[in-house]
């Protein structure tokens, strides 16, 4: 099994190009079921993308892959969908597999999807996915670990209020609603840029969607959608991760290929800590200027601070001058990186969904183990900050969400290699 060897203590200097957004490309790939052909560009080279390709192929899709140096192009032909079951062996690898449920059900009137897997960071139940599809007229039962869904005729437009903001359920609802009979109005929706990107792709395919980027989305169902081409937006979570990497190594890095407005909340939080962050053409520049203040943080649905960046921010706060309180409001059990950071000398105490982080002068290298995707990269940031050697085990999590991570960091001066 591979591991990463990190010799820290080197300030990152240079530029990093941001890849396509994992959390946008996966639902867009699922949306290909709604039409006959979808051409997607700026696709990141990630194992989760490979898992979604395998899933779509299992349903009968034909996928042409055009490989470029920094991205894939995918041409997905879904004219011959002939299997409506998403098997456990594929779905267990990735929670995003549940996003084929809405498209299969709304287009073909039936779907059988295994209850999903993915990162071990809490229950993340599918209740809201099921509730909104039932509101559209679907019959759904959970049997033997599978969601069995069917409808008599087309799904019907509905008004539905999500009990809590759910990115995943918002996506499945939108994917189903675009082919319903009538109008659907969704309240308390997720507002994430990746949801906006999915909606923009669906509009390119001929969908009628209003209220994009707000908590109230109105969708007028169509009889069918068109073939289309679409470029996926850049990954704000990857961008934020490298912004924190520049800060924790006392570096100076240009993050390129990202719109500033979708990372502005990250930039503002960094500025609070004393890090210099300025917009540049097609990106943002992050510069350490000699101080790192303790700052409290709460994760919240967008435009709040992303839960997917909480672990990385915590790594930064372990070296701050003071005490910070980090509150995780999205997922339970998302502090699994804390014991590993403490092995490196961090002073962190967890109380429920809150972590009290007391800054220390320096972390020390250690052998550590990744528990999930975002936790693994937080340990890399911690390792980069030390003046010693860190060995990170179970790095397969990284390849689910970060393209060419070692290469991008090495090009900015990091001493990091996979063995």
Swiss-Prot record:
InterPro entries assigned: Enolpyruvate_Tfrase_dom, Enolpyruvate_Tfrase_sf, MurA_subfamily, RNA3'P_cycl/enolpyr_Trfase_a/b, UDP_GlcNAc_COvinyl_MurA
Catalytic reaction list: phosphoenolpyruvate + UDP-N-acetyl-alpha-D-glucosamine = UDP-N-acetyl-3-O-(1-carboxyvinyl)-alpha-D-glucosamine + phosphate
Localization annotation: Cytoplasm
Sequence positions that bind UDP-N-acetyl-alpha-D-glucosamine: 95, 164-167, 308, 330
Sorted UniProt keywords: Cell cycle, Cell division, Cell shape, Cell wall biogenesis/degradation, Cytoplasm, Peptidoglycan synthesis, Pyruvate, Transferase
Principal location: cytoplasm
EC numbers: 2.5.1.7
GO biological process entries: cell division; cell wall organization; peptidoglycan biosynthetic process; regulation of cell shape; UDP-N-acetylgalactosamine biosynthetic process
CDD domains for the chain: UdpNAET
Single Gene Ontology MF annotation: UDP-N-acetylglucosamine 1-carboxyvinyltransferase activity
UniProt: phosphoenolpyruvate binding residues: 22-23
Active site, per annotation: 119
Pathway(s) per entry: Cell wall biogenesis; peptidoglycan biosynthesis
Modification type 2-(S-cysteinyl)pyruvic acid O-phosphothioketal: residues: 119
Annotated Pfam families: EPSP_synthase
GO cellular-component term (any): cytoplasm
Keyword Nucleus: no
Function text: Cell wall formation. Adds enolpyruvyl to UDP-N-acetylglucosamine.
Protein family per UniProt: Belongs to the EPSP synthase family. MurA subfamily.
PANTHER family to which the protein is assigned, alphabetical: UDP-N-ACETYLGLUCOSAMINE 1-CARBOXYVINYLTRANSFERASE
Protein name per Swiss-Prot or TrEMBL: UDP-N-acetylglucosamine 1-carboxyvinyltransferase
UniProt lineage: Bacteria, Pseudomonadati, Pseudomonadota, Alphaproteobacteria, Rickettsiales
Gene: murA
